[in-house]
């Protein structure tokens, strides 16, 4: 699947990684799986890594459907969700802008986009420089 997620409880963070073609159906499946995951918690921050996408679905009605579905689920949690997008290519920046603009504060989502990994880590308050460092640090603490 071109979208995966990993819950990092020590960071109160859900890391979502897209690769290849970014398709609405894959996103819906991944979000549904996350919503049913026993590790999912209200208020978890989301880091959405779009740096590996090579294409994206352009059916904007379906993209808005995805945002509405996710927004309804997150709004029921009665706490704000920080959605941080990492996008470092023209395509991933377009995808991130589309996703960011699909959220509203009334849905309880604060969405921001960063082009550099160190800026992402700083915004999340993590003492890492890169996403890989964050993932490795989290793995070491589990061992």
Where are these regions (language model features)?
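Amphipathic, Lys/Arg-enriched alpha-helical "gate/interface" segment within cytosolic domains
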Residues: 1-143
């Amino acid at each position: 699947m071109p979208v995966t997620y990993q819950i990092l409880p020590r960071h109160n963070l859900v890391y979502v990684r897209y690769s290849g073609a970014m398709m609405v159906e894959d996103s819906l499946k991944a979000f549904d799986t996350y919503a049913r995951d026993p590790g999912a918690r209200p208020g978890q921050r989301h880091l959405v890594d779009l740096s590996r996408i090579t294409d994206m679905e352009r059916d904007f009605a379906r993209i808005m459907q995805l945002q509405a579905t996710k927004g309804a689920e997150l709004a029921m949690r009665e706490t704000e969700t920080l959605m941080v997008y990492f996008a470092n290519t023209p395509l991933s920046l377009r995808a991130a802008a589309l996703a960011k603009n699909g959220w509203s504060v009334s849905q309880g989502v604060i969405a921001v986009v960063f082009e550099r990994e160190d800026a992402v880590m700083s915004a999340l308050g993590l003492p890492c420089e890169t996403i890989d460092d964050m993932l490795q640090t989290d793995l070491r603490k589990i061992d």
